[in-house]
């Protein structure tokens, strides 16, 4: 089972990279002035996918100064929905592994999942819109077999307004270029510290 999961994961990674390569080619041929937005979508996706500790907030703030905040928010929402579709599929495979099922069948997990199932859509929207960690709710969605369509819809409903607020804030405050670099480093340091703190706490 483990080897088959790895093979599927690599196929998903290839689909992920290929989709953005195709988008880059299409935009380059027909609307080259929006080429950097493809990279924005790519960055937004990997910060919710294979490199989750990458901060997306400074990038959304920056792009709010370069393009219409509504456009930035909409594309950010679409990119996040695309990557969450892939996340859902990967987690569906991982949670079928026997070692993982020993965790998801524990009493504490089933109790937490039960609370999630009382209001899954609202839970996903609130965690996606606010600083509340989204990852546990993503896992609950998969293990509780929550509708993929509703899951993706909740992601769009939650993330798009969040991106719009950030992009609009960026358009209003208009920091110097180095300001976004400092913000990026601050958010990155916080994310890495949190991950290390959790790892040491578990150890």
Question: Where are the model-predicted features located?
Answer:
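Transmembrane alpha-helix boundary and packing residues in multipass membrane permease domains
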Residues: 61, 88, 92, 139, ...
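Short alpha-helical segments used as structural interaction elements across diverse proteins
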Residues: 45, 135, 156-159, 192
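Hydrophobic alpha-helical transmembrane bundles that constitute the permease/transmembrane domains
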Residues: 81, 132-133, 156-164
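Membrane-interfacial helix-loop-helix
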Residues: 1-39, 66-135, 143-150, 171-203
